Amino acid sequence: MNYLKQYESFFWLIGIFIFYLIMAILTPLSTTDWHAYKVNLSQYLTQENGRYLGHLFEWVAVHNVILKALIYAITSFLVIYIVVYMVQLHTNRIYFILSFVFMVTVPNTIYSETYGWFTGFFSYIPATVLSLFILFMVVKIIESHDTVSEMQLWVFLLVSLFGQFFLENLSIANSLIILIGMVVYFFVKKRLSYFLIVGFMLSCIGNIIMFLNFNYFLIKDGLNTHYSISDSQGMIHKAGVTLFKLVPQYMFINQMIILTAVSYT
């Protein structure tokens, strides 16, 4: 009995992983997923938008059931693990359980666009994992650069580049996170961080590679019937509204209200 108690947290984590394995097996392929199944890899990557790694993972997943289940389960598990690890609560199983419960009780509209189909999953969830890792590393570098291992720094640089090929919004967000981290690091430490500078440059290179995809030029010109800009005044106006109105509102103002409310509960 004591032996089982000692490894109770491990059993919970295995249970969460197995749950996502089962969900991957039970989730049917959507029309878009079948399209990825029917075409060869080079054709799929050249015809679609700049989410190159997302499309690569999706293509591999729909062609191999075992890899599909493993990638789905590992990525879903990493979201929970990184969230709990970021707040240094990974030693207590209750926080893994709470995070898992919150993840599986999201509104069905959100679930259907993320976990409910593999095209959405491989665009949103890996991008979320990598963005969380970038945020974690930026905060850790600012707080105490000496505690960051060399391996973590090299992984951070790789993620800064390759994390840009999943989702447009998070690709831009990754660059902003690193840029803000550079500024904060300079004011706190009175010097520049080599790794943050290189990470920012790599993230910008990734953004350039992504947005040079011809589909984005078709979207800008209104020639792509599958994708469109949700702003009648064009792409530049939409970008301005997003950057100067929506981002401050939902990243800072609303979050401060939420955090203030939580602090008094």
Which role fits each region the language model picked out?
Residues 1-19:
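Start-transfer (signal-anchor) and selected internal transmembrane alpha helices
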Residues 3-4, 84-94, 142-149, 185-195:
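Membrane-interface helix-boundary motifs at transmembrane edges
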Residues 23-67, 169-176, 183-264:
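Transmembrane catalytic cores of multi-pass membrane glycosyltransferases
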Residues 47, 51, 101-139:
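Membrane-interface micro-motifs in multi-pass membrane enzymes
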Residues 72, 76, 123-135, 173-181:
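Hydrophobic core segments of transmembrane alpha-helices in multi-pass, intramembrane catalytic enzymes
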Residues 73-95, 133:
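Transmembrane-helix motifs of polytopic, lipid-linked glycan transferases
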Residues 80-85, 132-143, 156-160, 176-185:
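Hydrophobic transmembrane alpha-helices
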Residues 152-174:
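Membrane-interface alpha helices of multi-pass inner-membrane proteins
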